[in-house]
Amino acid sequence: EYFEPLLNLVRELDEQKRPATLVTYEGSNPVSCKVAEICDLLIINRYRGWYDTEGNLRGAAALLKDELEGFHKRCPDKPIMLGEYGADTIAGFHDINARIFSEEYQVDFLRAYGEVFDSLPYITGEHVWNFADFATAENIKRVGGNKKGVFTRDRSPKMAAHFLKERWEGIS
């Protein structure tokens, strides 16, 4: 009721006729989302396995897949892509058990998400969060900033950068 006239105005004013995009956040899901049908493209931001189910990538992947399937069932003709997904990683921190914050966990996290994407033919794209670590406001939750980058702040690659290079080179 609020968004549809607004979206229609945007479409009318956009001379380039670009797709109208909905970018969701963690609180929006296939049941609660109020605007999925009126946009042209769904972009889903999710951090299953990081902000919830941390350390449980099998459970995180199942939740992610269920959610993506729910959006597809609701909007079967809409392209869906992942706009944000990632896990904080301390560069140089390694753990044989791939615990959270380790470079191994970040790679396993990205691999788990990639397996979900690859199993769903209607997923049209993926955009990992983030290219490089970056500064954030000082607080006790993020020591030294957001560390979800696949490169450090000085642009040194983490293990994840090598993993993504291999993954994306293999996509046809």
Description of each model-found segment:
Residues Y2-S172:
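Substrate-binding clefts and catalytic carboxylate motifs of secreted carbohydrate-active enzymes
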